[in-house]
């Protein structure tokens, strides 16, 4: 299987998760930041990791999602919100909507530590972003448990691709 693993990361959280996926998947694979990502055509699976900005995938990832066409797509996100929060769920739904023809193989999201500089800016907003109350609990994430859960989600998606 030929896999393209693309990520956008500002603080290293999403890159860390993308590198874990790269270590998990066998076969021919390419790992690269979104701004250096090749055309996704010709890959059996595209894995895209992104961070959230305003409750949506970051702008570079949003632009890349428009290019995936009907590819098999696995999406994952890191964010300051709690895992399973309405904010995270809505953001993932928005990500899917940016690639309407893609075959969604699976999704995953988890908290990611928010940089102190960004957190300081977010605290000054009126109203504050919906994830701000969850941000302290995101410290130290993604951690080994988050990576293990991502690995489970990816492994669960792979058999569906072989069918």
Q: Whereabouts are the PLM-identified features?
A:
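Structured loop/turn residues at beta-strand edges in well-structured enzyme cores
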Residues: 1, 41, 102
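N-terminal beta1-alpha1 ligand-phosphate binding loop
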Residues: 2-24
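Generic structural signal for beta-strand residues in well-ordered domains
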Residues: 7, 38-40, 66, 97
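FMN-binding flavodoxin-like domain, especially the glycine-rich phosphate-binding loop
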Residues: 23-30, 45-48, 53-163
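Short acidic low-complexity segments
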Residues: 30-42
């Amino acid at each position: 299987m030929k896999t393209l693993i693309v990520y956008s990361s500002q603080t290293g959280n999403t890159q860390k998760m993308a590198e874990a996926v790269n270590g998990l998947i066998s076969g021919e694979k390419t790992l690269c930041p979104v701004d250096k990502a090749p055309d996704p055509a010709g890959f059996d699976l595209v894995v895209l990791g992104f961070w959230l900005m305003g409750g949506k995938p970051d702008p570079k990832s949003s632009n890349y999602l428009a290019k995936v066409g009907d590819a098999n797509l696995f999406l994952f996100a890191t964010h300051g919100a709690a895992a399973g929060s309405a904010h995270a769920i809505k953001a993932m739904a928005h990500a899917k909507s940016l690639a309407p023809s893609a075959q969604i193989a699976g999704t995953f999201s988890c908290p990611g530590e928010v940089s102190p500089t960004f957190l300081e800016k977010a605290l000054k907003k009126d109203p504050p972003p919906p994830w701000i109350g969850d941000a302290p609990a995101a410290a130290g994430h993604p951690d080994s448990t988050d990576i293990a859960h991502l690995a489970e989600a990816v492994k669960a998606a792979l058999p569906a691709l072989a069918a």
